[in-house]
């Protein structure tokens, strides 16, 4: 049974640790965090183990690097000497935006096998969309072990590494865009007289159901939009207002801006 070590238990690291504990024995999962109390609290919740960075680097089969891109160099400088002494096989798993597999290897000081992933926050409830690319040193059997261990996080989609940044601008940043949309829908409902809690529930469930309809029907979103817009009806008037406000262009610009920010992080 593979052991998984998570260095960094913030929003994404913590979400993936939760997912791992759904799929493998929790005593095979190790957590480390700069604030030890945070790792300890999550470990108690998940009934897994607390460790430190060095211990995870020494022994975990899959080492999840759950830190921000800006401090990845410091982390890998810290654990690099430990990795260099290892005789057992291990795989680094990076989720840092903008940092390529080659850059992670460079910072770690060795041509180590790396899996680059781009998860999103819904992974915390098993509904994530996780993009991933395996470096050349990762065997197919190891990829399968990784996927089996992380199946509780949601959907996984392999992607050429050159497209990870583009994909992350949609699926990784997208939850924030959708949350903003849900909030705006709820605000509109409140403006029309709905209680806040009801407006938020209606908006969130509508987005959830609409997303599932796209996935399960296989229909183009435009066709599903057209099906709701009756001639001379209320929906088409709302759509017209969104179009006049530049809704599509604003969403596209948000994705492009998020994508371009990756280049500042490299």
Q: Could you describe each region identified by the protein language model?
A:
Residues 204-266:
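NAD(P)-dependent Rossmann-like dehydrogenase/reductase catalytic/cofactor-binding core
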Residues 114, 164-169, 221-226:
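Short pre-catalytic strand/loop immediately N-terminal to key active-site residues, enriched for Gly-Thr
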Residues 103-113, 129-167, 178-216, 261:
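Internal alpha-helical scaffold of NAD(P)-dependent oxidoreductase catalytic cores
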């Amino acid at each position: 049974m593979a052991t998984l070590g998570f260095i960094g238990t913030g929003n994404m690291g913590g979400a993936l640790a939760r997912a791992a504990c759904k799929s493998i024995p929790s005593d095979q999962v190790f957590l480390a965090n700069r604030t030890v109390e945070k790792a300890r609290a999550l470990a108690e919740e998940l009934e897994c183990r607390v460790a430190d960075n060095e211990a995870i680097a020494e022994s975990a089969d899959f080492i999840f690097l759950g830190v921000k891109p800006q401090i990845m160099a410091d982390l890998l400088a810290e654990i690099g000497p430990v990795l260099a002494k290892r005789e057992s096989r291990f795989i680094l798993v990076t989720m840092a935006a903008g940092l390529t597999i080659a850059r992670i290897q460079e910072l770690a000081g060795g041509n180590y096998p790396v899996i680059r992933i781009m998860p999103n926050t819904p992974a915390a409830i098993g509904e994530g969309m996780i993009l991933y690319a395996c470096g050349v040193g990762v065997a197919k059997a190891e990829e399968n072990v990784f996927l089996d261990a992380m199946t509780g996080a949601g959907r996984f989609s392999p992607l050429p590494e050159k497209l990870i940044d583009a994909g992350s601008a949609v699926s990784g940043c997208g939850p924030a865009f959708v949350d903003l949309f849900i909030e705006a829908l709820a605000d509109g409902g409140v403006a029309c007289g709905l209680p806040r809690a009801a407006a938020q529930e209606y908006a969130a469930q509508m987005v959830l159901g609409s997303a599932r309809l796209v996935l399960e029907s296989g229909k183009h979103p435009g066709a599903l939009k057209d099906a709701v817009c009756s001639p001379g009806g209320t929906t088409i008037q709302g759509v017209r207002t969104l179009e006049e406000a530049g809704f599509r262009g604003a969403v596209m610009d948000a994705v492009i801006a998020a994508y371009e920010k990756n280049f500042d992080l490299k």
